[in-house]
Amino acid sequence: MSTLKVLIIGVLLALGASAGFTSPPTSINLSYDQAKGSLHVEAVHPSFNLEKSYVRLMNVYVNGQQVSTLNYFKQNDYNTFTDDVMLTAQPGDVIKVDLFCSLGGEMAQEMTVGKPSTGE
């Protein structure tokens, strides 16, 4: 086999192997507390090593405008990622969260802010 063919096969194998290690979140749940101005983010993100496989970046958007970028350096739980983000949103606003894994892969979720309950 020529050197070029060996090199191409090696690169393709390396790319295929690295794609197998990506571990994006498998689900994201969002809830917004309008009284507190707090967005609660909870994602299922299994991790084999909390310091190597974790949610490394969260981008938050309100009505398509990026309002927050948060960086993380480890995950605190082997199965879930959680965080609370302070932001202002009104009923009808669309909040989008995009989570990125340290090993590659991403997942996004949107929610529409509802009217606050009156307690009746």
Question: Where are the model-predicted features located?
Answer:
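Bacterial N-terminal signal peptides that target proteins for export
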Residues: 1-8
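N-terminal signal peptide c-region/cleavage motif recognized by signal peptidases
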Residues: 16-17
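Short, surface-exposed binding/anchoring microloops in extracellular/periplasmic proteins
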Residues: 24-55
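Exposed aromatic-hydrophobic patches
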Residues: 41-43, 80-88
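Beta-strand signatures of extracellular beta-sandwich domains
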Residues: 57-61, 98
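Solvent-exposed serine/threonine-rich low-complexity stretches and specific carbohydrate-binding patches
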Residues: 65-76, 112-114
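Surface-exposed, short loops/turns at beta-strand junctions within beta-sandwich domains
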Residues: 86-93, 101
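Short acidic/polar inter-strand loop motif in beta-rich domains
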Residues: 99-109
